[in-house]
């Protein structure tokens, strides 16, 4: 059996499989590797009111959890009459947040340090309440006595604080509302240079009877893909739930709609959030308190992810405080890990996380030294080549020796003709005599495939690559090369590598070898420039290494022949 030919066919088939997988995703079908298909944008956006904002729905207000026995189900009560709202714009050094006084809810979030992918002179809009996108953060209190209602995200609040721009290290944005004998003071505390917002709900019982409220923290979003989403490769947009028990769980909007999402319903730890490419939002309640997680479809193409916890009984004249954190920003792993356990897992590297995590850690360290992500990729490639050097050197020696015995292989083919069994036996006998491993020449490529895929996920999922330039025409390593120069270089280096290798005796095998650069190069036209840069540098180093080893073996063979 010709083992080398079998391996080459495996590599070629793997390449075709990757192309077919990307084509499936491009056409909105599920990934062959188990990932969900991209969420198709619904043909109908959530219904809007006269102002163009998303209409309120009593379905978006939860019932209180079972832990509050005196609570009544709010959806059965009449929704409060809409009041004229005030939009409050708050600015820090990294965020511009817009709050609606109706519900004291966050209705727009702009990330000032991250330019928009379509308009570089404007910041990325992560959250908004408009005709194009509905993505908001809401809170409220449920569990009022029958016929009453506590302040929810549909209740008019009034702004108490006056400062709207961060001048010191922190800025408090304070709203108040009173309903059903409960006064709720909602305080958002923003910090300089941070994307996590402290949120405190102070609840005071202003009535004459004990109250048992429950607080809900909620994110609402439509199922539309973020602007700039690639139609060629898939990135996840949907809900994420984390707990110490079940760890990181992802749920697509389509699964929420079909009511078949798998996630933890009861927990006293963790967080709940919404994830998209490079960015995320998440509610992180105080740890150690029992709560209920809910994912539901509010209306057509509008989904809610929320967590509800009982506050406990508040006696007349008494008060209670409930603290939480709200993350609104990039998927910065270091910053997220400092805010909540497991929050950094929103950066999902897939099934090769065990390789991708160390690669990202090494890249971060190298970037601290070099200050440029492009040169960081180059340096990382050199390190990877150094790690694989012993294996690669042995493989290139094997290929060089295969090239030396190529005339003998051709002679064997002519001798045995179509008798494949005798030909293979003669070839294997020659390999044993010459101490050649026919599989050795393929090992470097096979071994590097997991590293290649892991690095692909690192470059695709890490927000640090977004907008990161290299040199000259490469202004963003996270998107494809605008002039396709790197893919062309990659194809050229692959062709050169093939020329350095021994010509396969089988014509079909030789054709497969010549097609492979076109297959891989065609794939790279749509891949991030950073990934193609890695492959180009890797190929260049491989060529230099292979040429050096081959020349040394040729010199040794010539010297032996002259003795």
Curated annotation (Swiss-Prot):
Protein's membrane topology: Multi-pass membrane protein
Segments of this protein annotated with the region Disordered: 36-70
Compositional bias per record (Low complexity), positions renumbered to this chain: 54-70
A Pfam family: YidC_periplas
Gene Ontology MF: a single term: membrane insertase activity
Keywords, ordered alphabetically: Cell inner membrane, Cell membrane, Chaperone, Membrane, Protein transport, Transmembrane, Transmembrane helix, Transport
Gene Ontology cellular-component annotations: plasma membrane
Location(s) in or outside the cell: Cell inner membrane
Keyword Transferase part of the UniProt annotation: no
Main location: membrane
TM annotation in the entry: 6-26, 373-393, 443-463, 482-502, 512-532
InterPro entries in the cross-refs: Membr_insert_YidC, Membr_insert_YidC_N, YidC/ALB3/OXA1/COX18, YidC/Oxa/ALB_C, YidC_ALB_C, YidC_periplasmic_sf
Any one GO BP annotation for this protein: protein transport
Domain of life per record: Bacteria
Role: Required for the insertion and/or proper folding and/or complex formation of integral membrane proteins into the membrane. Involved in integration of membrane proteins that insert both dependently and independently of the Sec translocase complex, as well as at least some lipoproteins. Aids folding of multispanning membrane proteins.
Family listed: Belongs to the OXA1/ALB3/YidC family. Type 1 subfamily.
HAMAP family noted in UniProt: YidC_type1
Subunit field text: Interacts with the Sec translocase complex via SecD. Specifically interacts with transmembrane segments of nascent integral membrane proteins during membrane integration.
Full protein name: Membrane protein insertase YidC
Name of the coding gene: yidC
């Amino acid at each position: 059996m010709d083992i080398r030919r079998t391996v080459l066919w495996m590599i070629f088939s793997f390449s075709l499989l990757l192309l077919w997988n990307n084509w499936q995703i491009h056409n909105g079908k599920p990934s062959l590797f188990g990932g969900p298909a991209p969420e198709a944008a619904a043909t109908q956006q959530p219904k809007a009111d006269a102002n163009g904002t998303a209409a309120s729905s009593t379905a978006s207000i939860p019932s209180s959890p079972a832990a509050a026995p005196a609570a009544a189900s709010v959806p059965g009560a009449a929704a409060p009459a809409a009041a004229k709202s005030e939009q409050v714009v708050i600015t820090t050094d990294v965020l511009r947040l817009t709050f609606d006084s109706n519900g004291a809810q966050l209705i727009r979030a702009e990330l000032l340090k991250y330019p928009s992918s379509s308009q570089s002179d404007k910041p990325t809009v992560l959250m908004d309440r408009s005709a194009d996108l509905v993505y908001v953060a809401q809170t409220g209190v449920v569990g009022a006595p029958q016929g009453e209602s506590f302040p929810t995200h549909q209740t008019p609040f009034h702004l108490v604080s006056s400062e709207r721009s961060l001048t010191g290290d922190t800025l408090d944005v304070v709203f108040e509302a009173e309903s059903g004998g409960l006064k709720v003071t909602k305080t958002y505390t923003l910090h300089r240079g941070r994307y996590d917002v402290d949120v405190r709900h102070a609840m005071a019982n202003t009535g004459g009877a004990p109250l048992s409220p429950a607080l809900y923290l909620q994110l609402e979003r439509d199922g539309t893909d973020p602007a700039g989403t690639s139609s060629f490769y898939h990135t996840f947009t949907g809900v994420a739930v984390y707990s110490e028990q079940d760890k990181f769980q992802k749920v697509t909007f389509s699964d929420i709609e079909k009511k078949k999402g798998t996630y933890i319903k009861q927990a006293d730890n963790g967080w709940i959030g919404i994830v998209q490419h490079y960015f995320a939002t998440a509610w992180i309640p105080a740890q150690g308190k029992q709560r209920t997680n809910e994912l539901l479809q509010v209306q057509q193409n509008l989904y809610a992810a929320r967590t509800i916890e009982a506050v406990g009984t508040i006696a007349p004249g008494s008060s209670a405080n409930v603290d939480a954190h709200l993350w609104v920003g990039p998927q910065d792993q270091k910053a997220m890990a400092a805010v909540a356990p497991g929050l950094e897992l929103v950066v999902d590297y897939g099934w090769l996380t065990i390789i991708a995590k160390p690669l990202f850690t090494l890249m971060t360290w190298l970037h601290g030294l070099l200050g440029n992500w492009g040169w960081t990729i180059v340096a990382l490639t050199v390190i990877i080549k150094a790690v694989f050097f012993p294996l690669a050197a042995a493989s290139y020696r094997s290929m060089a020796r295969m090239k030396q015995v190529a005339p003998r292989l051709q002679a064997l083919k002519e001798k045995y003709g179509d008798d494949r069994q005798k030909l293979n036996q003669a070839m294997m006998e020659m390999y044993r005599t010459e101490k050649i491993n026919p599989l050795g020449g393929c090992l470097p490529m096979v071994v590097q495939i997991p590293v290649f895929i892991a690095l692909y996920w690192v470059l695709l999922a890490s927000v640090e690559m977004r907008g990161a330039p290299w040199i000259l025409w490469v202004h963003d390593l996270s998107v494809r090369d605008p002039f396709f120069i790197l893919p062309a270089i990659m194809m050229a280096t692959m062709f050169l590598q093939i020329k350095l290798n021994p010509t396969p005796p089988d014509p079909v095998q030789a054709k497969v070898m010549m097609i492979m650069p076109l297959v891989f190069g065609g794939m790279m036209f749509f891949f991030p420039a950073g990934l193609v840069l890695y492959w180009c540098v890797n190929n260049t180093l491989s060529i230099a290494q292979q040429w050096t080893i081959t020349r040394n073996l040729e010199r040794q063979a010539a010297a032996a022949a002259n003795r």
